[in-house]
């Protein structure tokens, strides 16, 4: 009989997905076991404990934007039900924080003083929003956009006539994916929203300026205001330490005097930082994240890490695709049989889709590469369609699509495979079906 207790710190998307995958794999193996030499049913016993500091476990953070917008209820975005956890030998402890770990004894200690043993320990502690260290950054009304508590706080301001105002003012710092999702959702809840962004155009890591301008026009038509090339200087507060606005300067023309935007709350969407404090505290090797190898093993025996708390090959991970792949790799690592070879984790190109109703947007590959490259461009201004494919040595380096993204999956496949497109390059923007017919003819 083999008994394994997996203890997972963090019940977010990475932790809960791994827990369920591991449980299903062990239960499947158990169902196929035969009779042992004593004539008894062979057993492969296991238990999984998920510990989460939030009062909720296993919800889809990607869907917090629709919850904020009022398009979904929070109850609809749970990844698994309580019954599913129970049926898969998974114990979930919410509102519980691991305060210390005895690595030698294979035990964790919680904030309530409980000691829990483990055979294998998995860090899935995720990340926390980065709050710009501006003057008054701890004031009431300054928040990130990461948890249900953040959503509840924003809804309280946007929907409940904050300070008696029918249309409260919300300011979002950061014009990336998360910031735009938050801004769009808050507008739908009746707030007046301004997005302050440090770069000269939105989504500057995923788009070029042409696509970004189309996107900005779309949001402006919904009532969102934008301040670009803005360098946030200080958060303004009243006598109760409640946010009243933001002071900023122009980071291009420094001769322009500082300006202030009035606001009832400030949402920071300027990136995240891996949550590694506990790992550092107990001596697990960390740099910007918890260091792991390509099988998700840390430098400490029987300790593993997956998700946004991880650093691999000097990279951090904030998208769901690599996080889920890490969970899959760890599953194989822990189920590896003697003499077998487990798959390993590697960094792959990722694609971006904006999760805002009415926006068709796709970006993949390295959009910053331009030297010695060809750019294939199609534009239809009357229908707000823009497509740009960047090619070098007859291989696609990146794709930016706005308005019509139906070929995004195909372009992404060509980027991943680095396929030679010389035979179809001139017709590439006509789409997959046309190009395949061209090659067949």
PLM ranges: what are they?
Residues 1-9, 21, 37, 80-169, ...:
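FAD-binding core/adjacent interface of flavoenzyme oxidoreductases
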Residues 2-3, 11, 309-409:
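Mid-to-C-terminal Rossmann-like scaffold of FAD/NAD(P)H-dependent oxidoreductases
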Residues 2-91, 185-205:
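Beta1-alpha1 glycine-rich phosphate/pyrophosphate-binding loop at the start
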Residues 25-45, 160-167, 239-241, 249-259, ...:
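Intrinsically disordered, low-complexity terminal tails and inter-domain linkers enriched
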Residues 92-109, 116, 189-292:
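A Rossmann-like FAD-binding core segment of flavoenzymes
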Residues 138-162, 237-247, 251, 260-332:
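FAD-site-proximal beta/loop scaffold in flavoenzymes
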Residues 153-207, 243:
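Rossmann-like NAD(P)H-binding beta-loop-alpha module
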Residues 246, 262-283, 359-440:
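C-terminal catalytic lobe of FAD-dependent flavoproteins
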């Amino acid at each position: 009989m083999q008994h394994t207790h997996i203890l997972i710190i963090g019940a977010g998307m990475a932790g809960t997905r791994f827990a369920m995958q591991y449980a299903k794999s062990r239960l499947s193996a158990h169902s196929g076991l035969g009779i042992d030499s004593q004539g008894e049913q062979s057993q492969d016993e296991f238990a999984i404990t998920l510990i989460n500091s939030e009062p909720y476990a296993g919800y889809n953070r990607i869907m917090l934007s629709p919850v904020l917008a009022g398009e979904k209820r929070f109850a609809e975005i749970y990844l698994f039900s309580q019954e599913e956890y129970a049926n898969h030998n998974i114990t979930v402890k919410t509102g519980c924080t691991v305060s210390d770990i005895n690595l030698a004894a294979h035990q964790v200690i919680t904030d309530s003083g409980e000691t829990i043993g483990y055979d294998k320990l998995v860090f899935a502690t995720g990340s926390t929003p980065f709050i710009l260290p501006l003057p008054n950054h701890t004031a009431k009304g300054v928040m990130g956009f990461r948890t249900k508590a953040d959503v509840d706080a924003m809804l309280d301001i946007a929907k409940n006539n904050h300070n008696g105002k029918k249309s409260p003012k919300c300011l979002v710092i950061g014009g990336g994916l998360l910031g735009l999702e938050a801004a769009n959702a808050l507008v739908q809840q009746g707030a007046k929203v301004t997005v302050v962004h440090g770069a000269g155009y939105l989504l500057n890591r995923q788009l070029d300026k042409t696509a970004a301008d189309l996107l900005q026009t779309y949001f402006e038509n919904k009532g969102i205001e934008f301040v670009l090339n803005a360098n946030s200087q200080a958060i303004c507060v009243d006598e109760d330490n409640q946010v009243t606005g933001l002071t900023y300067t122009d980071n291009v023309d420094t001769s322009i005097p500082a300006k202030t935007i009035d606001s009832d709350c400030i949402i920071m969407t300027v990136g995240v930082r891996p949550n590694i404090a506990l790992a550092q505290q107990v001596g697990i090797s960390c740099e910007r994240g918890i260091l792991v190898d390509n099988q998700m093993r840390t430098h400490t025996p029987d300790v593993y890490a997956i998700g946004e708390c991880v650093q691999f090959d000097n990279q951090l991970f904030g998208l769901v695709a690599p996080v889920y792949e890490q969970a899959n790799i760890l599953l194989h690592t822990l189920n590896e049989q003697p003499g077998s070879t487990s798959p390993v984790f590697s960094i792959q190109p990722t694609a971006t889709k904006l999760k805002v109703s009415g926006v068709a947007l796709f970006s993949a590959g390295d959009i910053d590469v331009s030297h010695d490259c060809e750019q294939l461009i199609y534009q239809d201004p009357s229908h707000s369609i823009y497509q740009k494919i960047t090619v070098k040595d007859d291989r696609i380096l990146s794709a930016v699509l706005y308005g019509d993204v139906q070929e995004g999956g195909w372009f992404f496949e060509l980027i991943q495979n680095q396929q030679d497109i010389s035979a179809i390059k001139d017709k590439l923007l006509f789409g997959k079906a046309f190009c395949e017919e061209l090659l067949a003819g």
